[in-house]
């Protein structure tokens, strides 16, 4: 591949879709068709490099790859970005689309338009990208090609003939799609002669080469050996390697306007390559940075603790190393009386939280326990400043003037026959309906504003079970609203166990308290004395369960005689039990914490 490519011969495009709509399979066929990967080296989900991606069949990290394609007797360079589809990784999609001029919006012919399809479509429109509608999996017997084509054309307000039909499995229509991208997608704009400006759209950590920064060149040219400058921080580094992914790394002498590639400077801290920052050179310095985009804000918070208390420093090191490849993780040290030393971590969503825990286990051999997920509340105590509380243990005591909880705008796409059931579920979760829109004669989109706390537990599972798996949903931050919230503490023999504390709506305090008390009464081993388990709001107990004492049969040796002998032994036992209850401590096995907390994730 020659170093110098004219901007008119470059096409930058992304593939966006709902999870499991065939993005990675289509990307595989494109890699084969363009000759980037030989048939011998080809494997399924070629661009999904993380083992979790391959096991779960989902894309987590975006991948940018440079390909060559001949069309109309001219050779073009195609820069393709394969993006995630799950709602938790919308941020990955948004930053990848900043490197594109066109977006292939892919819809499964067997499923039709889904919630995340619409969310990603809005991202593409916000980035002023050319939209290319494509229907995938058209070769399947269950595909409703005609219905899905009509639905997609209605959503995009385009002609039915504009929707392309492809099959990533057989390769049908893929060549025609690439030709269409070349003919319809606009070439990148930029000035080759002006001061260099490159937009960072991703960065990953490589244990051998340090931070690999993925960039799109917007102006000028940057070469190996140049001293580059980060415009937000002013930090300077010498460029050791420049290249493109084809799809394996391929070093080049330089990158110029419109090209997508990578920079390596030998820096070991990925936080020095902030996504959205602009790179320039110190010899020909740009004065105005490119409009970047903000870092993702965590939506869900949870405490992560090592099962083995001696592995705290190993957990810190593991999180530090994960942060190098996943800049969206946020964590601060915290201490729990029940669980010891750990970290309060912020995640983009529940799937993100699950994947981080799994990576800590697989990559660093760390067995961890996660507390129940919570969100960030704004709490204003009487006469004091507003606090942001992410951990129930930090909930202030005393009189509270106002509590605000974060809300999200939820979009639910479902067949029309389940609308009543979905509305019932959303109302039970304190949702406020904003509108309903019908797509064709079969499907509808319901828009609700809901508290984020109501969807981080089991909303998705409940939605799927009520709609037999047909509904899909997506959400975006909407702001915050005042709410009647309380902190529920769980007490064992009068002592608070902070790991089980939760901030819940006052209407759900009893159900939370009674369910977790019942669960603990089933899991905690019986003691020599009676153990009360109480759920309390402040000093008011709202639910209680009791673990009955293990009782020795002290009168077994009495075979007859005076009844007073038996009474004396029973009275002595009763006094001993009372004394034991005063001084005894309830030992809660670690398995109880694991079992209880895992059931409330």
From Swiss-Prot:
CDD domains registered for this protein in UniProt: EF4_II, EF4_III, LepA, lepA_C
One matching Pfam family: LepA_C
GO cellular component, one term: plasma membrane
Domain of life, per lineage: Bacteria
Compartment annotation: Cell membrane
PROSITE patterns linked: G_TR_1, G_TR_2
Entry keyword set: Cell membrane, GTP-binding, Hydrolase, Membrane, Nucleotide-binding, Protein biosynthesis
The keyword Cell division is annotated on this UniProt entry: no
Keyword Transmembrane: no
Example GO molecular function: GTPase activity
Name of the molecule in the record: Elongation factor 4
Species of provenance: Tropheryma whipplei (strain Twist) (Whipple's bacillus)
